[in-house]
Amino acid sequence: PGTNEYTITVTANGTGGSVSNLSKKITVLRLFDIPSAIMTGLTGGSSKVWIADKDTWGHLGVGPGPNQGAGETFYPSWYGATASGRTPAEYDDELTFTKTGPNSISLVLDNKGQTFIIPDYSGYYGLPGAMNTFNTTGTKALAFTDATSNTTSAISTRIQFTVPGHGLLSWGVGSNTYEILEITSTTLSVRSIGADGNAWYQKFKVK
């Protein structure tokens, strides 16, 4: 995805054997093609509401990032939240993914006025750690690309998306880019690299 620049040359043959050339540079925007499995999984072809999959181990978790020690484990090997193991206020967020065009998806996050910010990432959001008033209103147009991680198709869809600004999915983990590890019609598992290089994992389910 991105822009590509091309030079187009038109040659005109005139009377008497005269030839004239005209060249012009044009810029073409190439959009990333969102795979149908991702589009359908996130939006159902129209719109879907997602919530934290709080009954599943590791619905919030952390492990080593790509530049740490022995490398990534690609699962929350350092910490994984147990079923309903976080505070109740962390489980009331609703994420609405909507198909806004043949190749575009938007996100609206209703955090009920508060978001849990991981303490190490307070500077990223300009807020202290723990529960904070955080404005997530507005519709965010998501930008999809191929994943930049070293994951394989065995453990990831190899697709990631970015939420504009300091956008997030429920917990504030110091990143606005999320790799979709797994998606079904009812479950979603994502991974992101926090501001300090840790790999964070989150799991959601359809409401």
Model-found features: residue ranges?
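Surface-exposed, short loops/turns at beta-strand junctions within beta-sandwich domains
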Residues: 1-5
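Hydrophobic/tyrosine-rich beta-strand signature of extracellular beta-sandwich/beta-rich modules
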Residues: 8-10
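Short, solvent-exposed loop/turn segments at the edges of extracellular beta-sandwich modules
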Residues: 13-18
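Edge beta-strands of extracellular beta-sandwich domains
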Residues: 19-28, 201-204
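N-terminal helix-cap/turn-to-beta initiation motif at the start of protein domains
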Residues: 30-51
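Short, solvent-exposed loop/hinge segments that bridge or flank secondary-structure elements
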Residues: 52-102
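Contiguous, well-ordered beta-strand patches that form the walls/edges
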Residues: 80-183
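Short, exposed beta-strand-loop hairpins at the edges of beta-sheets
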Residues: 187-197
